[in-house]
Amino acid sequence: SGSLLGMCLIVRIITGLFLAAHYTADTSLAFNSVAHTCRNVQFGWLIRNLHANGASLFFICIYLHIGRGLYYGSYLNKETWNIGVILLLALMATAFVGYVLPWGQMSFWGATVITNLFSAIPYIGQTLVEWAWGGFSVDNPTLTRFFALHFLLPFVIAGLTLVHLTFLHETGSNNPLGIPSDCDKIPFHPYYSTKDVLGFALLLTPLIALALFSPNLLGDPENFTPANPLATPPHIKPEWYFLFAYAILRSIPNKLGGVLALAASVLVLFLIPLLHNSKLRSMTFRPLSQILFWALVANLLVLTWVGS
């Protein structure tokens, strides 16, 4: 699944570059520039749909990748694991700032709600939020800096990915039995290269199907309305890949408590290597751990469902 994440990143950087060429980061022009891209730019509609739906595929892959790492004890490669968690955080940040750029209703209010969470931090919270906004509300300065961040972060992710791989190559990767596999090593080409290309094909097929047949299936219809600071949408909610975290945030009736729970739900991944307490590395022969693992997966699915 790592190679799929790499391909997601490459596809999104390429489509993103083409989109950035036609995008204008200004509150009065952003919404119209996206509409212009879809209507007047050659294949602009396709580039935008691939870019927008590629995020969903990226998150599916990264969640599968994390689940696989948890199941097989890959987190015992501590450096690789920790950089992986940082990569997840960077991806979540990138997706968030990117969602704001079309400057529709959900873009604007999503940005307002999530940036506002920083005000829950004691003492420095309010200052921090106004500093992040560049004013007293989400406005033009916020949009321009979010565009800058959305352009920068994917390249940071690409750089971190190289570090992630470098650390992985120190030890070599793990396998389902959790035992050394030196005797089973085979040439990368044609074996792994073929396996990766098959993965690419299997990933690109649903992406292209989604982009061509139902590009707006996963989006929020609210975002077809240009941002209006005076009208709050009836239901503010994030894209599906953040729903589990949003459900945790909203289930706690205290601002700071919700923020801490939200942060903890992702940052807990940093603790996993410290919590490993078994003589066996992977869960292949540990039925109790398997039950807990699949309970965790079920929990995340239920949270995603409840959050919507």
Swiss-Prot record:
GO terms for biological process: mitochondrial electron transport, ubiquinol to cytochrome c. One of its GO terms (molecular function) is metal ion binding. GO terms for cellular component: mitochondrial inner membrane. Heme b b566 binds at H65, H164. Coiled coil: none annotated. It is a multi-pass membrane protein. Signal peptide: none annotated. Its cofactor is heme b. InterPro entries: Cyt_b/b6_C, Cyt_b/b6_C_sf, Cyt_b/b6_N, Cytb/b6-like_sf, Cytochrome_b_C_euk/bac, Cytochrome_b_N_euk/bac, Di-haem_cyt_TM. It is found in: Mitochondrion inner membrane. SUPFAM superfamilies: a domain/subunit of cytochrome bc1 complex (Ubiquinol-cytochrome c reductase), Transmembrane di-heme cytochromes. PROSITE patterns: CYTB_CTER, CYTB_NTER. It comes from the Eukaryota. Binds 2 heme b groups non-covalently. A ubiquinone binds at H169. Heme b b562 binds at H51, H150. The chain crosses the membrane at residues 1-21, 45-66, 81-101, 146-166, 194-214, 256-276, 288-308. Keywords: Electron transport, Heme, Iron, Membrane, Metal-binding, Mitochondrion, Mitochondrion inner membrane, Respiratory chain, Transmembrane, Transmembrane helix, Transport, Ubiquinone. Pfam families: Cytochrom_B_C, Cytochrome_B. Component of the ubiquinol-cytochrome c reductase complex (complex III or cytochrome b-c1 complex) that is part of the mitochondrial respiratory chain. The b-c1 complex mediates electron transfer from ubiquinol to cytochrome c. Contributes to the generation of a proton gradient across the mitochondrial membrane that is then used for ATP synthesis. Belongs to the cytochrome b family. Heme 1 (or BL or b562) is low-potential and absorbs at about 562 nm, and heme 2 (or BH or b566) is high-potential and absorbs at about 566 nm. The cytochrome bc1 complex contains 11 subunits: 3 respiratory subunits (MT-CYB, CYC1 and UQCRFS1), 2 core proteins (UQCRC1 and UQCRC2) and 6 low-molecular weight proteins (UQCRH/QCR6, UQCRB/QCR7, UQCRQ/QCR8, UQCR10/QCR9, UQCR11/QCR10 and a cleavage product of UQCRFS1). This cytochrome bc1 complex then forms a dimer. This is Cytochrome b. It comes from Garritornis isidorei.
